[in-house]
């Protein structure tokens, strides 16, 4: 039996302050703390007890089970079209995009064909994988800002990234699966790579190119769960960008000391010198 789930069962995935220090561990191993109760995060708790039920059946000898924790999947035919919101902005001639906290967040992603490879490796090595839980994801992970850059390059375009504090970067929520924080969700996939020999079948940059090509030929058919009010998002983005410009102008008027970093290691000029010109 191969079961497939995801990240919501990890404590802190939705509510970073459930952990100390706040936010998930980077990298995030399979044995990290999980949601403990419905009160903490009901959806995550249901994921957690579902995993437990699968593995209990394995322990009881009813079947041999392996559980795969999938990342955010991208590529053709995905029900959650996160990349589409970047593609659509470029098609709509938007020159900039609001991202939370400079778009530095890493949310583990996996190209559909690569994640299918993870399943096949599990099938082929059933005995070795039996009773195990594996995080899955592309070997090469990108920040949000990087995947915006990659998508824009694939469309022969560019897109300026406007950094807005995560609390106010609401137009980007569709791309973050509704997350209201910018903490990383960066899986540790060492077990899958070292035990089952996983490596990306399709390199990530090529995978994004294929994804863009798919969306250009097959715009997603959206439903009430996946549609987005882009007109409202664009209006909100324009307001946020205007405020951002005003703030930067205020920063530029400040007289700030430009501290020059000096490392602590001495640079003696000749043999026998005990200190250099900086007294190190």
Pin down the residues of each PLM region.
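Flexible, glycine-rich beta-alpha linker
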Residues: 63-87, 105
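Active-site Tyr-X1-5-Lys
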Residues: 27-67, 82
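Active-site beta-alpha turn of Rossmann-fold NAD(P)-dependent dehydrogenases/reductases
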Residues: 5, 58, 69-71, 137
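Alpha-helical substrate-binding/gating segment
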Residues: 87-97, 105-142, 149, 153
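Residue-level signal for the nucleotide or nucleotide-sugar donor/cofactor binding architecture
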Residues: 45, 110, 139-142, 187, ...
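N-terminal Rossmann-like NAD(P)+-binding domain of SDR-like oxidoreductases, especially those catalyzing
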Residues: 1-39
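Mid/C-terminal beta-alpha module of Rossmann-like enzyme folds, strongest
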Residues: 124-189, 195, 209-210, 222-225, ...
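Hydrophobic/aromatic beta-strand patches that form the interior of the parallel beta-sheet core
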Residues: 2, 66-68, 134
């Amino acid at each position: 039996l191969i079961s497939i789930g995801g990240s919501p069962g990890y404590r802190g995935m939705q509510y970073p302050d459930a952990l100390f220090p706040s936010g998930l561990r980077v990298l995030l191993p399979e044995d990290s703390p999980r949601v403990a109760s419905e009160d903490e995060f009901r959806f995550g708790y249901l994921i957690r007890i579902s995993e437990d039920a699968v593995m209990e059946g394995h322990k009881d000898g009813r079947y041999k089970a392996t559980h795969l924790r999938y990342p955010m999947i991208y590529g053709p035919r995905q029900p959650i079209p996160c990349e589409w919101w970047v593609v659509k902005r470029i098609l709509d001639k938007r020159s900039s995009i609001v991202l939370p906290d400079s778009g530095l967040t890493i949310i583990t992603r996996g190209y559909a064909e690569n994640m299918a490879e993870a399943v096949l490796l599990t099938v082929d090595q059933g005995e070795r994988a039996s009773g195990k839980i594996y995080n899955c994801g592309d070997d090469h992970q990108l920040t949000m800002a990087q995947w915006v850059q990659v998508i824009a390059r694939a469309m022969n375009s560019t897109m300026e990234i406007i950094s807005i504090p995560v609390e106010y970067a609401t137009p980007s929520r569709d791309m973050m699966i509704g997350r209201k924080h910018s903490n990383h969700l960066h899986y540790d996939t060492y077990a899958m790579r070292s035990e089952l020999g996983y490596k990306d079948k399709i390199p990530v940059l090529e995978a994004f190119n294929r994804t863009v090509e798919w969306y250009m030929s097959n715009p997603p058919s959206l439903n009430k769960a996946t549609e987005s009010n882009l007109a409202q998002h664009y209006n909100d983005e324009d307001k946020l960008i205007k405020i951002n410009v005003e703030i930067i102008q205020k920063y530029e008027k400040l007289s700030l000391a430009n501290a020059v970093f000096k490392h602590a290691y001495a640079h003696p000029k000749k043999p026998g010198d005990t200190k250099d010109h900086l007294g190190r």
